Each structure stands twice: as structure tokens, then as C-alpha cells.
């Protein structure tokens, strides 16, 4: 309801397959409740684009539903298989979504290594694609690498886990 401004998502394929808007199947309407300027997310995505770092597209919108004004929103491209296909050579890789915010309770998506039991990761992350394969080994491997590598091994092996040039661009921008 307009008095309780909530973020929401439009899924063009929810009821009819193969619908899209500008080749996007989903759009996220973010209420920016923690950003009174409404600028942080948009500026970060624009800076990322300017630095050739893959990032979702973002625009501003005044949103009306059935003639009623609902508010001002950031409209953001969904990070999904379509996004991966557009921005990466190997789009068949897994895409994980972090669950709870860092530090929120005992199941925070904190990139800590919790061993090899997938169940310990399923309460912190969700697999957003390749659900049939249900292969969590890459997430388990990267958390093990981050938390248990020696400094020398970390430096020597970083490029196997991360696209270092893109990562450095992101950190600089």
C-alpha cells in the first residue's frame, strides 16, 4: 500500500513464458529505505559501468499503480542467468545469493568456511541457478580458500578464484 513503501519485483514470466522488457525478465523496484538520497545504489552501478565492471542497470522511477502514486524507486536489473550471459563468457557457473545481512544472527552470509556439509551453507545462501545440479562445491571451495590459505598461497592462487583485474577495478572505483 502507498503508506507502507515496500520494495518489490516484477517478473514478466510469472504467468506467461518468454515475456520480457528490454530483454529483461525481472525488474527490482528498490525503496532505498536506508538511503534518504536515493543515490548510493545508482551511483555505484554507474561508477561500475564506467570502469567496465559488470553491474546491473539502474534507473529512477516515479511509480504509479492503478493511478495511485506509490513513490520514487530505484529500478534495478535482476542479477540472473540473463545477466550472466550478457556479462560473462562462462555463464553456466553457479550464482549464489547471500541470505541474511552480515552479522545478522547465526546464519549470516559471511563467507566463512563451515566445512564440506552443504546444509551449513544452504541456511546462509541460496543457489539462484543450476538448481538441478545442486552443486555447492565452488562456494565451499572459495570459502575454504579465503579462510584457510596461507598468505603466500592466497597471493599465488587468487586469480583461480577471482577475476583480479575486474576485482581491482571495482575496489578502485
What label would you give each PLM region?
Residues 1-5:
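ATP-binding glycine-rich phosphate-binding loop
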Residues 7-17, 24-32, 51-56, 68-173:
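Internal "kinase-insert"/substrate-recognition segments embedded within catalytic cores
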Residues 18-19, 37:
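Short active-site-adjacent helix-start/loop capping segments
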Residues 21-22, 40:
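Short, conserved acidic/polar surface loops in the N-terminal third of protein domains
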Residues 33-53:
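A conserved alpha-helical element in kinase catalytic cores
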Amino acid at each position: 500500500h502507498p503508506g507502507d513503501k515496500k520494495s518489490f519485483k516484477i517478473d514478466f514470466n510469472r504467468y506467461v513464458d518468454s515475456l520480457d522488457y528490454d530483454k529483461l525478465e525481472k525488474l527490482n523496484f528498490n525503496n532505498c529505505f536506508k538511503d534518504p538520497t536515493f543515490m548510493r545504489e545508482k551511483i555505484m552501478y554507474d561508477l561500475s559501468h564506467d570502469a567496465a565492471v559488470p553491474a546491473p542497470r539502474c534507473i529512477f522511477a516515479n511509480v504509479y499503480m492503478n493511478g495511485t502514486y506509490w513513490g520514487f524507486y530505484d529500478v534495478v536489473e535482476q542479477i540472473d542467468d540473463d545477466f550472466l550471459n550478457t556479462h560473462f563468457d562462462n555463464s553456466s557457473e553457479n550464482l549464489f545469493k547471500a541470505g541474511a545481512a552480515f552479522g545478522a544472527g547465526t546464519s549470516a552470509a559471511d563467507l566463512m568456511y563451515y566445512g564440506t556439509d552443504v546444509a551449513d551453507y544452504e541456511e546462509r545462501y541460496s543457489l539462484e541457478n543450476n538448481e538441478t545440479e545442486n552443486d555447492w562445491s565452488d562456494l565451499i571451495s572459495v570459502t575454504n580458500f579465503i579462510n584457510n590459505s596461507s598468505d603466500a598461497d592466497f597471493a599465488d592462487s587468487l586469480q583461480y578464484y577471482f577475476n583480479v583485474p575486474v576485482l581491482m577495478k571495482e575496489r578502485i572505483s
